[in-house]
Each structure stands twice: as C-alpha cells, then as structure tokens.
Design a protein with these regions (language model features):
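N-terminal start-of-chain detector that recognizes signal peptides
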Residues: 1-5, 33, 50-53
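Short, charged/polar N-terminal "headpieces" of proteins
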Residues: 1-26
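Solvent-exposed, flexible loop/coil residues
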Residues: 5-9, 32, 41-44, 82-84
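Short linear sequence elements within intrinsically disordered, low-complexity coil regions
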Residues: 8-10, 23-24, 37-39, 58, ...
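Generic detection of intrinsically disordered/low-complexity segments and helix-coil linkers/edges
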Residues: 12-13, 26-28, 47, 75
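A short, structured beta-strand/loop element
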Residues: 18-41
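Acidic, low-complexity intrinsically disordered segments
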Residues: 45-88
C-alpha cells in the first residue's frame, strides 16, 4: 500500500477541512470534521480552522493514515471525527 498526502488543505462549506491524498495511485479525499479540530483546541484560542489544522497537521495525518491502514477508506474517502482523536 502506497500512501502520499499531497495537500494543500482547504476549507469546505461545512467548516470541515479537506486534504487530498493518493492511495495506490488513486485519489483519496481526507476530511477532518470541524468538531474534531475544535477538540484539539479546547480553550478556543485559535479561531482559524485552517490554521488549527496546520498546527496539528502531523498528528491528524497520522491518525488518518492509521484509519486507512485499518481499512476505513471507503469509496475513495476517509473521514476523521472527534471520536477518532486520542488526546494526550
């Protein structure tokens, strides 16, 4: 399995963040829920969702990679929600 995160991150109309990837030569849509991103900043210090994503990008992409390896990529997409986060 070959996975490449190609980016860049963009904001969807729903407030979620989209980050494109390529899995075994096919486009893969990675989305990160607005709620999950908010959970990373419980104090509400960062109000820019894209900046919040960029601040936690490595952790978020690592979690999505694990979801993909566990077979959770369906129909060319994988979604990260609050319950997927393992907060320190």
């Amino acid at each position: 399995m070959k996975l490449e995160f190609v980016g860049p991150a963009s904001l969807l109309e729903t407030g979620d963040v989209f980050y494109p990837a390529v899995l075994d030569g096919k486009d893969l849509k990675c989305s990160f829920s607005y709620e999950a991103l908010q959970d990373l900043d419980p104090e509400g210090v960062e109000t820019n969702v894209l900046q919040l994503f960029k601040t936690h990008q490595l952790k978020l992409l690592s979690i999505v990679e694990q979801k993909i390896l566990n077979g959770h990529a369906v129909d060319g997409a994988v979604h990260l929600f609050s319950h997927d986060l393992v907060l320190d």
